[in-house]
Amino acid sequence: MTKKYDLVIVGGGPAGLMAARVAGENGLSTALLERKTDITQVRRTDGGILSPVNEYTFGQTVVYNHEAKKISFPVSGFSISYDGPHKDVYGFNLYSPNGNKFTFGDRVEQRKDPKKNRYGVAVDKALFLKPLLEEAIRNGVDVFPGTNVTGIEKKGDRVAVTGNGKTYEGCFVIAADGVNSRIAGLMGMNKERKFCATHLQNFWSLEGIEIPEIEGLGFIFCADKTFSVVSTCHENRFSVGVSSYRPCDDLPAALNRFVHEDKVYSHWFKGGKKTKETSCVVNMYSPMKEPFKDNVFFIGDAAWLTEIANPGALCCGWKAANAITLALMDGKINKEGIGSYLEWWHKYFYGPYGKKEIKALELQDYLDADDIDYLVGLVKEPLFGTLDFYKLIDTIGSTYGELFPTIQDERPQIMAKLLGLVNQMEEAEQEVRKAGFPSK
């Protein structure tokens, strides 16, 4: 038997749960379909960091009020409840194979006024997802966990979604099913997008360790792989991971060597206990210029290159559900009715960032350990503090652009490699795409 709703939401992450909460608050008959049986359980790689704090990304900023147990989004005008541990995040460190580093942000200055100077807040993701789910249910949303969506089609003025042999119809559908969106594949949305790479990650949760110099994120360029160390909201617990654009790479083995054998960094993890291991595989496509087709919205990660981050996903869910509410009120159950969302998406997401080229390259293919040590060691002072990925990339680019004369003078052979990399960029990108396995 077909169940009929105003709105059907596929995906119970931050974007989907926020959309469900808002749709329920607004009185829409709503169904939420989620593949996991325990919707708020975080089973894949996620650092749990909320940012931007004290800066703007995608036109938004985050305010965390520990005393009120609220995470607020003052630009959009909503908040969510959070009653759990937290830790201030002060920035980003970049390390070379032999221990050179530079930082984004000055920790000494930042710590003088943490609330004003932090760039993010580490939280327990499950503990802010849980209230969203509970509020959605209280607001009358029908929730169907353990539902694997296998089909979607337009039927007249409605959209039918099939999962586990059952059909759910809505005037609108929100696809909030993540960066590897099945709905996007079923509806042919990826055909017009550029496939960039398949990105793999493997992470361990390590308890019982202290790394005082990392109060946020650390990226470590070792001789063979790039590793990351993320400070979590829990004391003496870090998330340590490795990534690659080569699906054939043995990432667990590489991570094991880094944690237990690396001559420079393994001391960070001495005595640590591995309590959890997670992985993720992301097929990276260029962002959607228009994330809407046949009354289906694609929001959050489903419409972006990689993860749009938790705050971005929450804002997408909030905006989409409100746009659909107005469309139904105005009797415009079509693209015109939700035009406010598409304008917002283009203004804050696709317009500023959608055409930016992200180069999916393995730096170690072009530079050896000594080269990377030299380049990292050139940066003597803290750089502009931020957790905005695009600002990080721009800052690195402008910093080394100014250092090119020094590199040419001191290490002309490294400069030649850098120029060679620029000339080989297209070929390198083709190799990365060839190694991947794009979603259909």
Regions found by a protein language model. Give the residues of each.
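FAD/FMN-dependent oxidoreductases across multiple families
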Residues: 86, 246-328, 332-335, 339-340
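Predominantly flavin-linked oxidoreductase catalytic cores and closely associated redox partners
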Residues: 36-38, 131-266, 304
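N-terminal Rossmann-like FAD-binding beta1-loop-alpha1 element of flavoenzymes
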Residues: 3-32
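Helix-loop-beta segment of a Rossmann-like dinucleotide-binding subdomain
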Residues: 101-127, 158-160, 233-245
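Active-site-proximal substrate-binding core of FAD-dependent oxidoreductases
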Residues: 322-372
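Short, well-ordered coil/turn residues at beta-beta hairpins
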Residues: 11, 176-177, 299
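N-terminal FAD cofactor-binding segment of flavoenzymes
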Residues: 22, 35-98
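C-terminal auxiliary extensions adjacent to catalytic cores
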Residues: 365-440
